[in-house]
């Protein structure tokens, strides 16, 4: 009731500004400001330049961006496939089985991602499945880390589905496979695209597990940012970070547009 009054709305906006600006907006604005600077003296950056961005979109930085895009795309598609399959399977299980499956998929989220990276490194550093030193081990680790979010998103969407559509299709003689591909999955499409976008964004920003696994020829952009700032190249690292943020945001906006179109079908 408080927010419906004029004073309540002003208080809500004031609280939002008080929390949003120092916690979210200002740190990002500082990174953007640093990306255009050559040095920082006093309270503000100085020496404005665009050379940091010129370096951020060529050479090793461009290769790292491509690596991140390929890794995130592959991991999000794999996570979406596995998470959707698990969510559909869990919907047919009893309560205890569903809880067990949910807990199994949430396990990688419950532990630090560096632990997941170590587990993948130990598990796949020897035959018969030797992935250490390849790009596949990075994609696998990212898939493990983001599958839980795909599983939870699709599971929540399945619970909200009206069973009348499936029942109507089945009563007309449609086979289970046809009902799945032509009825159920199209109804889940908005949730599937949202889950894919979330998995993509999480994969694009993953660092801890990646640091333990990436080979020299498969360095994702977050690792590139870390190594740049670790060497003292704070301003060029900030430019690369802005490129990472912008790329992820553009992909999320595209996914949101696809989801909106799917919702109106």
Where are these regions (language model features)?
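Short cytosolic juxtamembrane segments of multi-pass membrane proteins
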Residues: 1-2, 258-265
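Membrane-water interface segments at the C-terminal ends of transmembrane alpha-helices
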Residues: 8-41, 54-159, 183, 187, ...
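Transmembrane helix boundary and interhelical loop/hinge segments in multi-pass membrane proteins
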Residues: 36, 46-49, 157-167, 176-178, ...
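Short hydrophobic, aromatic-rich alpha-helical segments embedded in or entering the lipid bilayer
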Residues: 44-57, 216-230
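Gly/Ser/Thr-rich beta-alpha loop segments that engage phosphate groups in nucleotides
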Residues: 85, 175, 217
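Hydrophobic positions on the alpha-helical face of helix-turn-helix-like DNA-binding modules
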Residues: 168-169, 179, 183, 225
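Glycine/proline-centered hinge or cleavage motifs at structural transition points of membrane proteins
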Residues: 172-174, 186
């Amino acid at each position: 009731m408080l927010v419906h009054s004029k004073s309540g709305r002003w208080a809500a906006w004031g609280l939002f500004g008080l929390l949003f600006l120092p916690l979210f907006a200002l740190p990002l604005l500082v990174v953007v400001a640093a990306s255009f600077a050559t040095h920082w003296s006093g309270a503000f950056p100085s020496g404005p330049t665009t050379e940091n961005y010129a370096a951020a979109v060529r050479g090793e930085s461009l290769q790292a961006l491509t690596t991140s895009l390929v890794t995130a795309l592959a991991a999000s598609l794999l996570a979406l496939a596995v998470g959707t399959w698990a969510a559909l399977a869990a919907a047919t299980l009893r309560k205890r089985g569903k809880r067990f499956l949910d807990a199994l998929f949430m396990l990688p989220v419950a532990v630090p991602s560096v632990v997941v990276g170590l587990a993948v490194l130990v598990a796949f550093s020897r035959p018969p499945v030797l992935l250490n030193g390849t790009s596949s081990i990075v994609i696998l680790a990212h898939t493990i880390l983001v599958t839980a979010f795909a599983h939870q998103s699709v599971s929540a969407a399945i619970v909200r589905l009206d069973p009348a559509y499936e029942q109507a299709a089945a009563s007309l003689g449609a086979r289970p496979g046809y009902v799945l591909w032509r009825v159920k999955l199209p109804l889940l499409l908005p949730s599937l695209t949202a889950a894919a976008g979330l998995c993509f964004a999480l994969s694009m920003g993953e660092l801890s597990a990646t640091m333990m696994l990436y080979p020299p020829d498969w360095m994702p952009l977050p690792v590139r940012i870390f190594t740049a700032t670790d060497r003292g190249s704070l301003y060029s690292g900030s430019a690369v970070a802005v490129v990472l943020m912008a790329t992820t945001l553009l992909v999320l906006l595209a996914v949101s547009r696809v989801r909106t179109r799917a919702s109106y079908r």
